Every structure is written in structure tokens, then in C-alpha cells.
């Protein structure tokens, strides 16, 4: 069980997140929607403790996450994997190494500094890449990949952490519709197959409806909607996104990312190369 209790964040006089209280059962997939500046990203960064709450508390499995320090905090950031819109990869390092960096908080400092990884870690990393259909990129510099491929590498890196919770901050904001679907399919697969809680910030209403069993709407730093996709009425959407200058509500087709694609794509295959051979194993 994950809980936020009256979590607030101020930046000077600006109230970015205003007394948010949420309870999320283990294994739920939650989409947080709202306009830019609604407080979505700040909320996720506080959950991961990349930013500190000004007040309120955060709890996971009975532990007050907002009070953790030192090694306990590093362990939480390992257990609560974060996926960013900007991917946060090391462009000059190959894809395989970027994925294995997800093991940093599981390893000794010396091994991490020397980038020495075990055979088991390499096998695990290749399996994560294979699961996301990009094992053929294992030895390429991460900076040479497309945006969609880089986001899948970031998801593979998150899997390497063996997380209990995954936070995805606008994971498809910079992607085309095809890659957006691939990334969202991957997040849903993680949620359904491992039973890992996934909380993702999204701009697009159709994506939230199609992938998330629960939707949280934010406006002005506050939660103004919390319910099932079927409960997200036109009035609720208007409260979340506001109206245009004529007072009309938002047209959901303006945020659509819908696209129909086959489950498997030929360019995701590794042309017969065995996955372990890609890692020199």
C-alpha cells in the first residue's frame, strides 16, 4: 500500500502541490492527468524523494518514505524506479551498460565506479532489452538511438532495479504515436506481469483511458478528480483542463495518440542473432 497524506510543495510563494492525499493499492496502474503546471511532475519527484515535501508525509508498506535518510533513502530510490521524459541515459555508453547502471544501488561502490558487471547482470540486462524488443541495439551508443528506443532503454534500466514501484514522468510526451504505444504497452506489461505499481503522468486523455485502471486529475496543484476511466465525464475533464476563451470544454481529439499497430514489428527483431551473443556471453 502506498499513501500520500496532505503532501504539499511550495516554491517561494508559489504553491505547486496543495495538500494531496491519495491511497494506491499495490499493483495498480494509475494515470495522473492535467495541464502543464498542474503539479504532476513535482508530485512524482516528491514520491521518489528527488524533491522534498514542504509538509505532509509519504508512506510505502508502513514505512514513512518522506523521513528516510542516507542508505535507507538510496534503497527507496532503488525500489521506486523513475522513468523520465528526457530518458536520462549516458549517450556515449553502449545500451547494455546504460541498462546495467540500474544495478548501481545493488552493488559495491568500487564495482560501480569501475563499471564492472557480473555475467548474471549482463544476462539480466539482455533479457530486459529482449523483453522490450531492442536487444539488437545492445552494443550501440545510447545516443545513436531514436527517442522511442531510448525510452525503452530507460524502461529496461528501471527493470534492472527490481523495483516495487515505477514512476513514469511524461514518458511519451516527446514520442510519435507509434513509439508512444510501444512504451505504454511496456509499462502496462510490467504492471500486469510483475504486479508492480505504476504511476504515470500523461497529457493525453485517450492514453490514460486506454491504459490506466485509475485516473487522478490535477489542477492548480490539487486533486480534482480520482476515479475509474468510465467516471471521467465531460464535466470532470472541464474541471481538470479548464475551458477555452469561449467557455467551451477541451476537445479530447486534440490530445489523441491513437494508432493501430501489430503486436510485433520486424524491426524489433535481432535478425537471428542470439541475445547473449550480443553481450559477448
Swiss-Prot record:
The record's section on Gene3D superfamilies has:
P-loop containing nucleotide triphosphate hydrolases (3.40.50.300)
InterPro entries xrefs: AAA+_ATPase, ABC_transporter-like_ATP-bd, ABC_transporter-like_CS, ABC_transpr_PhnC, MetN_ABC_transporter-like, P-loop_NTPase
Q: Give every ABC transporter domain span.
A: 2-245
User: Which positions are annotated as binding ATP?
Assistant: 34-41
Note the SUPFAM superfamilies from the entry: P-loop containing nucleoside triphosphate hydrolases
Cysteine pairings via disulfide bonds: none
Location in or out of the cell: Cell inner membrane
The keyword Lipid metabolism appears for this protein: no
User: What molecular function terms (GO) are annotated for this protein?
Assistant: ABC-type phosphonate transporter activity; ATP binding; ATP hydrolysis activity
Give the catalytic activity: phosphonate(out) + ATP + H2O = phosphonate(in) + ADP + phosphate + H(+)
Instruction: For this UniProt record, give its keywords in alphabetical order, as a comma-separated list.
Output: ATP-binding, Cell inner membrane, Cell membrane, Membrane, Nucleotide-binding, Phosphonate transport, Translocase, Transport
What is its membrane topology?
Peripheral membrane protein
Q: Which Pfam families match?
A: ABC_tran
Origin superkingdom:
Bacteria
Q: Does the keyword DNA damage apply?
A: no
Would you tell me the Gene Ontology cellular component terms? Answer: plasma membrane
* PANTHER family, sorted: AMINO ACID IMPORT ATP-BINDING PROTEIN, PHOSPHONATES IMPORT ATP-BINDING PROTEIN PHNC
Q: How does it assemble?
A: The complex is composed of two ATP-binding proteins (PhnC), two transmembrane proteins (PhnE) and a solute-binding protein (PhnD).
Q: Which family does it belong to?
A: Belongs to the ABC transporter superfamily. Phosphonates importer (TC 3.A.1.9.1) family.
Q: What is known about what this protein does?
A: Part of the ABC transporter complex PhnCDE involved in phosphonates import. Responsible for energy coupling to the transport system.
- Quote the protein name from its UniProt record: Phosphonates import ATP-binding protein PhnC
Q: Which organism is it from?
A: Rhizobium etli (strain ATCC 51251 / DSM 11541 / JCM 21823 / NBRC 15573 / CFN 42)
Amino acid at each position: 500500500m502506498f499513501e500520500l497524506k496532505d503532501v504539499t510543495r511550495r516554491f517561494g510563494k508559489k504553491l505547486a502541490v496543495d495538500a494531496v492525499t491519495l491511497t494506491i493499492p499495490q499493483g495498480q496502474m494509475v494515470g495522473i492527468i492535467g495541464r502543464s503546471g498542474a503539479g504532476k511532475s513535482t508530485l512524482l519527484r516528491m514520491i521518489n524523494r528527488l524533491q522534498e515535501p514542504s509538509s505532509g508525509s509519504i508512506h510505502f508498506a508502513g514505512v514513512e518514505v518522506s523521513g528516510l535518510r542516507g542508505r535507507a533513502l538510496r534503497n527507496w530510490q532503488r525500489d521506486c524506479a523513475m522513468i523520465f521524459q528526457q530518458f536520462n541515459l549516458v549517450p556515449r555508453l553502449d545500451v547494455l551498460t546504460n541498462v546495467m547502471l540500474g544495478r548501481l544501488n545493488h552493488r559495491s561502490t568500487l564495482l560501480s565506479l569501475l563499471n564492472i558487471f557480473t555475467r548474471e547482470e549482463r544476462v539480466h540486462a539482455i533479457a530486459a532489452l529482449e523483453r522490450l524488443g531492442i536487444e539488437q541495439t545492445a552494443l550501440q551508443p545510447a545516443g545513436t538511438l531514436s527517442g522511442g528506443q531510448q525510452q525503452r532503454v530507460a524502461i529496461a534500466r528501471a527493470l534492472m532495479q527490481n523495483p516495487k514501484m515505477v514512476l513514469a514522468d511524461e514518458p511519451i510526451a516527446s514520442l510519435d504515436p507509434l513509439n508512444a504505444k510501444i512504451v505504454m504497452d511496456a509499462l502496462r506489461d510490467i504492471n500486469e506481469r510483475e504486479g508492480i505499481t505504476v504511476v504515470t503522468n500523461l497529457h493525453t486523455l485517450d492514453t490514460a483511458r486506454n491504459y490506466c485502471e485509475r485516473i487522478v486529475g490535477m489542477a492548480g496543484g490539487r486533486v480534482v478528480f480520482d476515479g475509474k476511466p468510465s467516471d471521467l465525464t465531460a464535466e470532470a475533464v472541464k474541471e481538470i483542463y479548464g475551458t477555452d476563451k469561449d467557455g467551451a470544454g477541451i476537445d479530447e481529439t486534440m490530445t489523441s495518440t491513437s494508432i493501430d499497430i501489430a503486436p510485433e514489428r520486424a524491426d524489433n527483431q535481432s535478425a537471428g542473432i542470439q541475445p547473449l551473443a550480443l553481450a559477448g556471453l
